Each structure stands twice: as C-alpha cells, then as structure tokens.
Amino acid sequence: MRIILLGAPGAGKGTQAQFIMEKFGIPQISTGDMLRAAIKAGTELGKQAKAVIDAGQLVSDDIILGLIKERIAQADCEKGFLLDGFPRTIPQADGLKEMGINVDYVIEFDVADDVIVERMAGRRAHLPSGRTYHVVYNPPKVEGKDDVTGEDLVIREDDKEETVRARLNVYHTQTAPLIEYYGKEAAAGKTQYLKFDGTKQVSEVSADIAKALA
C-alpha cells in the first residue's frame, strides 16, 4: 500500500499519518528525515545534499528522488509506505512515475483556510515546558496562564494569523496543480484519489480512512 498525503499545514495530516502507519504497519517517509539521515551517514547522496545545503541552495529533485528510491528498497517498506511532504510539484510527481514508483492512494485532507486559521491562531504555548493549549478546544484553567506554573502563555510566531495565511497561500499555489494532476491519474485508473473532510472529529476521519483503505 503506497500512499501520498496531501493537506494544508494544520489540516490534521500528521495525526492521520500516525493512524495509517499503526493500522497498516507501513513506515512514514519524510524527505526531511531522509536528508538528515543521509547526511549523517555520509552516503553519496548525503554528501551531494550537504554540499548543496552548505552553499545555501535548495536540494534538487534528483537528489530527493534518489533518496526515496534508496529508502523504499529497505525491508520495512515491503508492505508499502506513506509519503509525507512529497511530491510538492508536478516535476516531482513526474519523477516518481518515471522511477516506476506507482502510488495506490492519494489522500487529501480538506479543511477551509478560515478553519485552519482558527485552529492555529487559537493555540497558546508555555515555552519553557513545551505545553500547548487552545483557547477553544483545550483552554488553560486560567486564561493566558500555564496550568502547572501559572506563567504567561504566548502565541508562537508560526501560529500568528498572518504567518498561517502566508503558509496557506504557498500551499495552495504549490498543491492545487498536484490535486488536478492526481485527479487525472485517478480518472485514468492509475491511482485512487480519496478526499476526506478534515473538519470532522479525529476519530471519525480515522474511521473513514480505515473503511476506504480496507
């Protein structure tokens, strides 16, 4: 079972990725983790990637695709894998296809931007401990204060509305063409495209996924 996950930041992708991994016994392949591991191990591709990163440039699709090919040849990917954060562009999707990596399911989590902004902008953090709260879904006992220490809670830079909206714009610009691309692939019978309502309860979304992939 080879799966690609698509969904905006804050759409609940990470939570459902965990569920799919545990339910179907397949590893999650994150390009960031792979890059770090290859650089640490000093592999040929890792050395190439390090040179590019040290020069302050973006790692090329060829290097990333090479890493993915190496990674999915490992024993734990025998039953399949979950690709998270890749592909992000049409050339990357084409690259996977050219390498003969067929994808069984493309899963999209659909959540309106305003809902994501509300989810993210409502987050509050106690930085010293890493504890997080949400003004609506998981409020602290005393507004603006950490439950344990009583210290002030803050809004992280990443959770501020303007930051969230900027990230969403990037996501839509990059991913809208991919959604269309995989829609066409599905229409041609080359993959299955599944879209889930990410505004439902986490357990409901998980149940919907389990049913669709059964």
Curated annotation (Swiss-Prot):
Tell me which residues bind AMP.
Answer: 31, 36, 57-59, 85-88, 92, 156, 167
Instruction: Give the GO molecular function terms.
Output: adenylate kinase activity; ATP binding; nucleoside diphosphate kinase activity
Q: Which E.C. number(s) belong to this protein? A: 2.7.4.3
**Which Gene Ontology BP terms does the record give?**
AMP salvage; nucleoside diphosphate metabolic process; nucleoside monophosphate metabolic process
- GO cellular component labels: cytoplasm; cytosol
Pathway annotation from the record: Purine metabolism; AMP biosynthesis via salvage pathway; AMP from ADP: step 1/1
Instruction: Please name every pair of cysteines joined by a disulfide bond in this record.
Output: none
> Where are the stretches annotated LID?
122-159
Q: State one Pfam family annotation.
A: ADK_lid
Where does this protein chiefly localize? cytoplasm
Reaction catalysed? AMP + ATP = 2 ADP
Family annotation (InterPro entries): Adenyl_kin_sub (IPR006259), Adenylat/UMP-CMP_kin (IPR000850), Adenylat_kinase_CS (IPR033690), Adenylate_kinase_lid-dom (IPR007862), P-loop_NTPase (IPR027417)
Binding-site residues, ATP: 10-15, 123, 132-133, 200
Q: Which UniProt keywords apply?
A: ATP-binding, Cytoplasm, Kinase, Nucleotide biosynthesis, Nucleotide-binding, Transferase
Which protein family is named in the record?
Belongs to the adenylate kinase family.
What job does this protein perform? Catalyzes the reversible transfer of the terminal phosphate group between ATP and AMP. Plays an important role in cellular energy homeostasis and in adenine nucleotide metabolism.
Q: What is this protein called?
A: Adenylate kinase
Q: Which gene encodes it?
A: adk
